[in-house]
Amino acid sequence: MNLSCSLVLLGGGKGERFNSLQPKQYTHLCGEPLILHALHAYQRLPFVQEVVVVCEEQYRELFLPYSVKFASPGTLRQDSVFSGLQQVFTPWVCIHDGVRPFVYADEVIEVCSAARKTGAAALASPATYTIKSCAPVRTLDRDALAVIHTPQCLDTEVLREGLLLARAMDFSLSDDTEAAELLGIEPTLVFSNRVQIKVTYPEDLLFAETLLSKSSTYK
């Protein structure tokens, strides 16, 4: 199966919950910015044809040693994705958060393969916590729920149309595959059996450092 795709790497978030002077995606993990851990992993994948980094202009110097394109971030995540999408010229696109430094080749391959069948796919984990809705307060069936991560892979035109529809509806998307859902497409979920780290708080960085220092399989 031809898995050729572009990567849109999101590096425009401000990370206000991280309590740092710089955005968390540029905080160092074992000597290297978080976002570069993700970039290096994707650059090792031969089917990734091009990389678009969505970031503020002041951080672009960090990526100059690499063969990447740039796009400017927007107000919302979906605006940043749409901005990156303007630089994409392949039929398929993979979206990844710059604050998710752990990228596993087999999971990217599985997500991209699954997307070819339905038009959209996302990496996921089973919900393991008890989750309640707030209004009214009631317990949800966690067996029917999943936690969504990146990578997420979509047909480029499906994502573009879904993002435009969301904008026309003034609708805030929770993730990228929700753009496909707006078009009536049911995304495929690819379940991971690994710990999926999104660095949101300082404690997440400590956990990531511990995991990385003890792992020989991170690739």
Curated annotation (Swiss-Prot):
Enzyme class: transferase
GO BP annotations, alphabetical order: isopentenyl diphosphate biosynthetic process, methylerythritol 4-phosphate pathway
Record has Transferase as a keyword: yes
PROSITE patterns: ISPD
InterPro entries: IspD (IPR001228), IspD/TarI (IPR034683), IspD/TarI_cytidylyltransf_bact (IPR050088), ISPD_synthase_CS (IPR018294), Nucleotide-diphossugar_trans (IPR029044)
Pathway where it operates: Isoprenoid biosynthesis; isopentenyl diphosphate biosynthesis via DXP pathway; isopentenyl diphosphate from 1-deoxy-D-xylulose 5-phosphate: step 2/6
Catalytic reaction annotation: 2-C-methyl-D-erythritol 4-phosphate + CTP + H(+) = 4-CDP-2-C-methyl-D-erythritol + diphosphate
Site note Transition state stabilizer, residues: 17, 24
EC number: 2.7.7.60
Recorded family membership: Belongs to the IspD/TarI cytidylyltransferase family. IspD subfamily.
PANTHER family registered for this protein in UniProt: 2-C-METHYL-D-ERYTHRITOL 4-PHOSPHATE CYTIDYLYLTRANSFERASE, CHLOROPLASTIC (PTHR32125:SF4)
Functional note: Catalyzes the formation of 4-diphosphocytidyl-2-C-methyl-D-erythritol from CTP and 2-C-methyl-D-erythritol 4-phosphate (MEP).
Name recorded for this polypeptide: 2-C-methyl-D-erythritol 4-phosphate cytidylyltransferase
Encoding gene, per UniProt annotation: ispD
